């Protein structure tokens, strides 16, 4: 095959939808980061979700990039998930004004969750990005958060020293409970 035809085939392949999608794109590089720690949230004998924290170095540093990935073991409505999020923010001492503003901002971050669905929040530089992966499908960007206060508050649910689930936090940070 001559060089011109090879070049044409390569150009056509690159132009095809879906080509080079996945962990090779810079926005999805977090998938290849090593795990810092992992934890499972249970209620009684029911598993609610499994979570993992990832970072480029495999160690957590608050100001460095990191990704929180949650795999749900149960169906959860978007309203119930938002209520749980707001309840955790209330526990952490955020004001009603902040919680209402953030709830509005997160309106499109996720929909109803089904067993096996995954959500990820990737924090880097001055922003955060929400991703959703319905069971058996590819990751999709659902929301970019430019509000650093919101990005920090969302992660505080799991990573704050004042979290409602300190053992869960320690496990995510790779610490021994």
Where are these regions (language model features)?
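Terminal leader/tail segments of proteins
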Residues: 21-177
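N-terminal signal peptide c-region/cleavage motif recognized by signal peptidases
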Residues: 15-18
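Bacterial N-terminal signal peptides that target proteins for export
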Residues: 1-9
């Amino acid at each position: 095959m001559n060089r011109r035809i090879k070049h044409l085939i390569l150009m056509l392949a690159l132009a095809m939808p879906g080509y080079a999608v996945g962990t090779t794109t810079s926005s999805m590089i977090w998938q290849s980061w090593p795990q810092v720690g992992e934890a499972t949230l249970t209620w009684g004998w029911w598993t609610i979700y499994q979570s993992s924290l990832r970072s480029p170095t495999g160690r957590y540093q608050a100001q460095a990039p990191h990704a929180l990935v949650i795999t749900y073991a149960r169906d959860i409505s978007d309203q119930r998930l938002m209520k749980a999020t707001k309840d955790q923010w209330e526990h952490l001492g955020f004001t009603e004004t902040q919680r209402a503003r953030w709830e509005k901002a997160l309106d499109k971050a996720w929909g109803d969750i089904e067993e096996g669905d995954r959500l990820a929040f990737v924090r880097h530089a001055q922003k955060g990005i929400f991703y959703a992966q319905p069971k058996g499908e590819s990751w999709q960007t659902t929301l970019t958060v430019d509000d650093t206060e919101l990005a920090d508050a969302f992660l505080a649910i799991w990573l704050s020293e004042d979290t409602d689930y300190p053992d869960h936090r320690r496990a995510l940070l790779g610490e021994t409970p």
